[in-house]
């Protein structure tokens, strides 16, 4: 083997070895932290609901025009006897579309929904409680430059009178954590 050929072969082997190692290192990196899940603790969720939810999980639901990240707890499972109402919290950073909360505040509540302003939750907050279509409670909060959207739905046998205080308590807990510069 000539020195030139040996050098080329050695370069090829080293390149393949180093590239594979670098790719493997890239795969071992931790995924970026989801900013939605830390907005609520398991203890806060269990205290507000009186149920044992366990940890929430980040989920990519294609956040739509406003972006953001979502964390979900509960929901429909394989065993209906163990189903818990679904609770979701979305952290929405500032974006080109403006405030998610202000956008929805400018719209009328949906058919079968009532709207109530919340005081002492973030800079601006309101709750929509819907009995008919999409039965559940939605809380919209503007806190600093960010928005929080909290949903309690898939209520199974629980009434809105159970869901609304749960949603408001969780929004009160999440709002200060979502306020970031």
Locate each region found by the language model.
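Exposed alpha-helical structural elements
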Residues: 44, 99-103, 162, 166
